[in-house]
UniProtKB/Swiss-Prot annotation:
InterPro entries, sorted: P-loop_NTPase (IPR027417), Thymidylate_kin-like_dom (IPR039430), Thymidylate_kinase (IPR018094)
Function: Phosphorylation of dTMP to form dTDP in both de novo and salvage pathways of dTTP synthesis.
Protein known as: Thymidylate kinase
Organism: Legionella pneumophila (strain Paris)
Molecular-function annotations in GO: ATP binding; dTMP kinase activity
Stretch forming the signal peptide: none
E.C. numbers: 2.7.4.9
EC category: transferase
NCBIfam families: DTMP_kinase
HAMAP family, per database record: Thymidylate_kinase (MF_00165)
GO cellular component, one term: cytosol
Positions annotated to bind ATP: 13-20
Length: 212
């Protein structure tokens, strides 16, 4: 990504971890430094991506959408997002703040769905061609607490309706991925909002200092 002038910052975590709040905080911190930003979400962020999101998230497709189809839909949406939104923004110097990216697929499909990680990595290499975030923040939350918080938002979507064991597998896989990729910043999201935001602010301010 050295040829691109902007930066891609990704916020990761389970349902209820506070990703949307974190995205808003990062945007605010960057705006204070006069850095132009855009936000994205996965799956979605483009016209095609939002259509695919409506399929992936729709509870009507419980026990209908094959895991392999789900995986391919996610990568189709990600390719569109990268090529239509993220790269053009980075090329003009904007910083992109993304609610989920590649790590989610490894955790949810690889961990939660128990899909073959080698296959996912091969598909990732083919689709992304080495494209990676400049910074990833993983908001670590206990799955039970996360689902309590998520439930307060309203009716569960297709993914949120999965069993608690599903989310424990995702949580465990996130931890493995963080250990394998020390550049990922893990933040304890079980704490109060003020404490979580303070940790995020420290990471972002240090990142800005080294990238301006």
């Amino acid at each position: 990504m050295s040829s691109l002038t902007g930066k891609l910052i990704v916020i990761e975590g389970l349902e209820g971890a506070g990703k949307s709040t974190a995205v808003n905080l990062v945007v605010e911190l960057l705006s204070q430094k006069k850095i132009s930003t855009i936000t994205t979400r996965e799956p979605g962020g483009t016209r095609i991506g939002e259509i695919l999101r409506s399929i992936i998230k729709n509870p009507e497709y419980n026990n209908v959408l094959d895991d392999r189809s789900e995986l391919l839909l996610l990568y189709a949406a990600r390719i569109q997002l990268i090529e239509q939104v993220i790269k053009p923004a980075l090329n003009v110097g904007q910083w992109v703040i993304a609610d989920r990216f590649e790590l989610s697929t490894l955790a949810y499909q690889g961990g939660g769905r128990k899909m073959n990680m080698r296959v996912i990595n091969e598909l990732s290499n083919f689709c992304l061609k080495g494209f990676k975030p400049d910074l990833t923040l993983y908001l670590d939350i206990n799955p039970e607490l996360g689902m309590i918080r998520a439930k307060s938002r309203g009716k569960f979507d297709r993914i949120e309706q999965e069993s608690i064991e599903f989310f424990h597998r995702i949580h465990d896989t996130y931890h493995v991925l963080v250990k394998q990729n020390p550049e990922i910043m893990m933040i304890d999201a079980n704490r109060s909002l003020d404490e979580v935001q303070s940790s995020i602010q420290s990471v972002i301010e240090e990142f800005i200092e080294h990238n301006l």
